[in-house]
Curated annotation (Swiss-Prot):
GO terms for cellular component: high-affinity iron permease complex. High affinity iron permease; part of the reductive iron assimilatory system (RIA), a siderophore-independent high affinity iron uptake mechanism. It is found in: Cell membrane. It comes from Epichloe festucae (strain E2368). This is High affinity iron permease ftrA. Residues 326-350 are annotated as: Disordered. The gene is ftrA. The chain crosses the membrane at residues 11-31, 56-76, 91-111, 148-168, 179-199, 207-227, 293-313. Residues 333-342 have a biased composition (Low complexity). InterPro entries: FTR1/Fip1/EfeU.
Amino acid sequence: MAKDVFSVPVFLVVFRETLETVIIVSVLLAFLKQTLDDGSERHVKTYKTLRRQVWLGVAAGLLVCMIVAASLIGVFYTVGSNSWENSENYYEGAFCLLAAVIITAMGAALLRIGKMQAKWRVKLARAIESPIKAGTRGCFAHWLEKYAMFVLPFITVLREGIEAVVFVAGVTFSAPARAVPLPVCVGLVVGGLIGWILYKGGSTAKLQMFLVASTCLLYLVAAGLFSRGVWSLEAQKWNIAIGGDAAETGSGPGSYDIDNSIWHVNCCSPTAADNGGWGVFNAILGWQNSATYGSVISYNVYWIFVMVGFCTMRFKETKGHYPFAKPKTADPSVNSRSSSSSQQGVDVGKTAGVEIAGAPGA
């Protein structure tokens, strides 16, 4: 039968995790191509360096993910227990929150590039070429700026990869081993194909349209990640309270904390084996069939923070200072020095003119 060689739950899990990864990676690659691949020798060199950072981040995340997965499998078959499962939600929540913060900062920077494209080209080139000086105050910040295109893909691939390994391992207990390889490969290929389409579309679109669309997409993912991170931390707290994994009880009573629940539906669970694609909504939008106060409030707080942040940035661009801050006034000493310099220049010019006028033969 088809289900003996192709497990649909495994395909959905792998496709969901791959999709979230390729969205971020394809946006980064398309952004680099739009911004830096203009034929200039210096910019082309910077473009190749940053593109290499993206792929190195993907490869490093995949390598660490494979090491962690091998360790988990080894511990499971040696000790007979899943050591990751006991604190899975803590790790997932921390990774989600960290990724949301990084994507938020990068999204704001992406949106400003349309007006500051030339400045960003120079800034990226300088960040790549300038060495990191040990012991300086901004050493870590400079390192993050220099290798930003490595850090985000690394964290994304690591988080999604470990999550996929854990979910696939859980699904395979109810499916034959031969039903796993094919859906894993198909999920990776389909997710990669969607990423390639996003990359090609982003590379050929007008820069400002691409920046707006990609930033909106990144913020949707980041908002979902932020909400999922808070939800995972609350889910771990509930697991500790009941002394087990609440997900194993299904979607009915006992699978959620009724005192901390805003809504709950006994279907549409993103973690169920027959989720019917709800896992994709969970990956992109942060959907949960059992919403908690923390997950809903954090989702709304995230968007309020983003709106306030962009309003503040806009105010700073138009007014020259932040809200509730006094406008910068010109330094009188600087003005006096500049005016005296100008007056000296005028006096010198007049003196030179008099000398020329009084010269013989003038």
